[in-house]
Curated annotation (Swiss-Prot):
Annotated catalysed reactions: 5-[(5-phospho-1-deoxy-D-ribulos-1-ylimino)methylamino]-1-(5-phospho-beta-D-ribosyl)imidazole-4-carboxamide + L-glutamine = D-erythro-1-(imidazol-4-yl)glycerol 3-phosphate + 5-amino-1-(5-phospho-beta-D-ribosyl)imidazole-4-carboxamide + L-glutamate + H(+)
Enzyme category, top tier: lyase
SUPFAM superfamilies (UniProt xref): Ribulose-phoshate binding barrel
Major localisation: cytoplasm
PANTHER family found in the cross-reference section: IMIDAZOLE GLYCEROL PHOSPHATE SYNTHASE HISHF, IMIDAZOLE GLYCEROL PHOSPHATE SYNTHASE SUBUNIT HISF/H IGP SYNTHASE SUBUNIT HISF/H
Pfam families named in the record: His_biosynth
Protein name as catalogued: Imidazole glycerol phosphate synthase subunit HisF
Amino acid sequence: MLAKRIIPCLDVTLDESEARVVKGVEFVNLRDAGDPVELAKRYDEEGADELVFLDITASPEGRRTMIDVIERTAEQVFIPFTVGGGIKSIEDINTILSAGADKVSINTAAVKNPEFVREAADIFGSQCIVVAIDCRRNFDLSKGEYIVELEDGTKAWYEVVIYGGRKPVGIDAVWWAKRVEELGAGEILLTSMNRDGTKDGFDIPITRKISEEVNIPVIASGGAGTKEHFYEGFVEGKADACLAASIFHYREIGIREIKEYLAERGVQVRL
């Protein structure tokens, strides 16, 4: 069995020409968490398995990802490194991988043009292509394809949202996960907008459903607040990796502390 991965996420925005890491609740009310290069270095030293670097203002504002920051971060970091945000073309992917990233994460562009996933996977290899799926619970069951039972017994389906969670697109997240796997995605980064930034725990019902429906790794994202949440994400949610931002940025829990806790509870991690 492959070791489960712990992945800090750096949500980066441009502040008067300086890149800063920010974190908000459900993608709004963003607060400053520091310099991305310094944080990336710290996480590498603390035992993170990988990093995800999301330029969260790139898609909505149509701005290209901050290549200089990627280059500086890549120089300091020796673990695999994924970059997303505003990636719309093969040229964008080439630029980012050339700047030092190991993988790219595609979200909005994949929804608008699914063939982009296939083309990217054909050129760069599936191992470089992560499709990020942001989704939100929808209780109008007539519109969903895969109905998921929630923790309290109510039922919902999960609708894909794009542009940083701002625009619902009427696509079922489970159906979309299966589709991007067919198109050649090597991994899925799944964020439940219902949990993002809440620290209430990962959204187990949708994480488990998608993990069961696809054969590629699923990264659970949105809601991590305690060590137990990581255990739940791996064991109940069947995720291959768990991603978090604010609890790491503000030093609420250390990466090593989480890994030691998981190992004690029988989850295989890289210590």
